[in-house]
């Protein structure tokens, strides 16, 4: 069941000031951005309408500091231990930095009290060796594990979609969906493929392992509204969902009773009482 709660974005970012946070945490420096040339730190950069559907694009999209700072904030504020990232880039650098900070601040407690076996790891998946090497060769990211996967057309409940194969065998508490692009899957489903300028990305990987995720897991999609709606229509467990239209972000939080003592400890430590307040609200939905 999906519980739509537009207040989730306010809960996730309570106390967050993007301009202050970007400066305090060196987000621009991490992303390789010159602040003197960037402009307003709090506003999104407008793109050419065809930029994201250009199959010949050979350069990464320009960094958006508002989005990157929010990702950094989420990792720290939710005491994230394990990240699964679909599509890598500047976000990978940001995740690495945030996980290093969490490792310094949290590892002693987490190692002794929680069942988290991929602690402070970001597992980043991409089907392009080029982009993996671009990040790997330019940055020393010791918390990042790179996964080169094939991208194939497939189906979920009869609906055409894409899958990465293989996937890393980890249990993330934060999933960031920013890949794949729509032009590179292999194969088709009865002639249907995402490889067309009028189509859009439609990844179904999360649906395959949804039943393994632990309560408290957060999914963030960067834009990809059609894909987010596909997830929303096919996720089977109890999720709190919010579309932040201004930021062009979608958030899904797995909002269920803890699975057991270790999951309860994780929720108490990472998310606190506000999680159980949301859970109580959802029961009246």
Which residues fall in each region the model found?
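S-adenosyl-L-methionine
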Residues: 128-170
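Conserved class I S-adenosyl-L-methionine
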Residues: 79-89
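C-terminal substrate-binding/active-site "lid" region of AdoMet-derived donor-dependent transferases
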Residues: 180-285
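Conserved SAM-binding loop of SAM-dependent methyltransferases across substrates and taxa
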Residues: 90-115
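A short helix->loop->beta-strand "cap" motif at the edges of active sites that frequently abuts
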Residues: 103-104, 118-120, 214-217
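Class I SAM-dependent methyltransferase Rossmann-like catalytic core
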Residues: 36-79, 93-97
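Short SAM/SAH-binding signature in class I
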Residues: 165-179, 185
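Residues in the short beta-alpha loop(s) of Rossmann-like NAD(P)-binding domains
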Residues: 89, 126-129
């Amino acid at each position: 069941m999906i519980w739509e709660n537009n207040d989730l974005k306010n809960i996730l970012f309570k106390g967050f000031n993007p301009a202050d946070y970007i400066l305090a945490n060196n987000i621009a420096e991490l992303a390789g951005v010159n602040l003197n040339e960037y402009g307003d730190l709090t506003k999104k950069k407008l793109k050419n309408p065809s930029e994201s559907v250009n199959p010949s694009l050979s350069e990464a999209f320009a960094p958006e500091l508002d989005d990157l700072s929010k990702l950094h904030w989420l990792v720290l504020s939710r005491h994230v231990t394990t990240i699964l990232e679909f599509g890598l880039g500047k976000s990978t650098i940001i995740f690495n930095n945030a996980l290093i900070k969490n490792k310094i601040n949290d590892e002693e407690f987490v190692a002794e009290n929680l069942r988290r076996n991929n602690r402070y790891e970001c597992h980043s998946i991409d089907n392009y060796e080029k982009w993996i090497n671009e990040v790997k060769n330019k940055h020393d990211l010791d918390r990042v594990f790179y996964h080169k996967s094939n991208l194939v057309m497939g189906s979920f409940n009869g609906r055409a979609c894409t899958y990465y194969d293989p996937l890393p065998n980890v249990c993330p508490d934060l999933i960031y969906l920013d890949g794949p692009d729509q032009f590179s899957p292999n194969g088709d489903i009865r002639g249907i493929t995402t490889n067309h300028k009028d189509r859009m990305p439609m990844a179904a990987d999360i649906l395959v392992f949804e039943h393994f995720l632990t309560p408290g897991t957060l999914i963030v999609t960067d834009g990809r509204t059609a894909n987010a709606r596909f997830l929303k229509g096919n996720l089977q467990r109890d999720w709190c969902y919010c579309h932040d239209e201004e930021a062009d972000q979608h958030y899904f939080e797995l909002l269920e009773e803890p699975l057991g003592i270790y999951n309860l400890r994780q929720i108490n430590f990472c998310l606190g009482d506000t999680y159980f307040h949301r859970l109580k609200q959802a029961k009246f939905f």
